[in-house]
């Protein structure tokens, strides 16, 4: 409902894609709403690709805004992104200033870096006060990727480098698409005046569990194999150390999840 109100206020022409029909019944007949029902949980990449493929069928589609289901935006957030994309034709993917929804004085991130020899992702300006001032160009030189909760992508990018990689079920999809875009000489940039509030928890439970740990580690391994294969041996050694540490702490579910990543065994969860 909130995203519909935003679209009506901010855009003359829009296409809203959703997996749920329940709250859209009265809007569908306006001819501005298209509802797509997924047959199964395909994860972040697979689910978003359904909508992206549909949008790309239209010759009028210039940009695609991928937003998590646990985000809310300011009324001018989209227009700022469109203006910057129109101004600089070399930009392929834009990000917004992500702010914690439940603590709107604190920044979640302005983009991210990947530390390949430590196998870690790191959000830039994480936990800084929202009143902190940042230069868009300076921040953009520091980032390796746009945070996946809010990706504003030129349609041309998907046509050139391909869709989100569905090998990843959760995590690292945005790193993958951003690295592929950069290899094709598209620029990444964060527009810090464009604000997106992220509840960070509606998509994935905040509680650390075997399911989320498995997918984070598995996706990290897939990403390493694809872009940093020289570090794969060290990553596997790190997994062995993590397994031993989980066992030592009595965290046997997490140890089992780590072991499955190491051995390449699929994690089966009744909720997916």
Each language-model region and where it sits:
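Acidic donor-binding segment of Leloir-type glycosyltransferases
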Residues: 1-40, 50, 54-58
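Acidic/His-rich active-site region of diverse nucleotide-sugar glycosyltransferases
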Residues: 5-6, 10, 16, 29, ...
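Active-site acidic Asp-centered loop
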Residues: 38, 67-69, 165
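Acidic metal-phosphate-binding loop of nucleotide-sugar-dependent transferases
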Residues: 42, 70-72, 168
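Short beta-strand-to-loop acidic/aromatic patch adjacent to the donor-nucleotide binding site
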Residues: 60-72
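Short glycine/serine/threonine-enriched helix-capping/active-site loop
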Residues: 66, 93-97, 191, 199
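A short, conserved alpha-helix in the catalytic core of glycosyltransferases
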Residues: 144-195
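Non-catalytic, C-terminal membrane-associated alpha-helical segments of glycosyltransferases
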Residues: 210-221, 225-272
């Amino acid at each position: 409902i909130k995203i519909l109100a935003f679209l009506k206020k901010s855009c003359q022409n829009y296409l809203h894609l959703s997996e749920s029909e329940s709250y859209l019944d009265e809007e569908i007949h306006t001819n501005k709403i298209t509802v797509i029902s997924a047959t199964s949980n395909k994860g972040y990449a697979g689910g978003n690709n359904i909508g992206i493929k549909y949008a790309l069928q239209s010759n009028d589609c210039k940009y695609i805004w991928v937003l998590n289901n646990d985000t809310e935006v300011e009324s001018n957030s989209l227009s700022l992104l469109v203006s910057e994309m129109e101004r600089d034709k070399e930009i392929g993917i834009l990000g917004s200033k992500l702010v914690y929804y439940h603590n709107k004085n604190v920044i979640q991130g302005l983009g991210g870096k990947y530390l390949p020899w430590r196998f870690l992702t790191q959000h830039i300006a994480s936990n800084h006060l929202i009143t902190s001032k940042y230069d868009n160009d300076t921040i953009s030189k520091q980032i390796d990727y746009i945070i996946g909760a809010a990706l504003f992508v030129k349609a041309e990018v998907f046509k050139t480098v391909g869709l989100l990689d569905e090998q990843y079920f959760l995590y690292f999809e945005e790193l993958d698409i951003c690295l592929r875009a950069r290899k094709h000489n598209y620029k990444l940039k964060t527009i810090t005046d464009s604000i997106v509030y992220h509840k960070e928890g509606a998509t994935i439970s905040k509680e650390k569990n075997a399911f989320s740990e498995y997918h984070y580690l598995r996706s990290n391994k897939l990403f390493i194999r694809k872009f940093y294969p020289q570090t794969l041996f060290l990553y596997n050694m790190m997994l062995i150390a993590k397994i031993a540490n989980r066992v030592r702490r009595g965290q046997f579910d997490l140890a089992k999840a780590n072991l499955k990543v190491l051995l390449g065994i699929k994690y089966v969860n009744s909720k997916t």
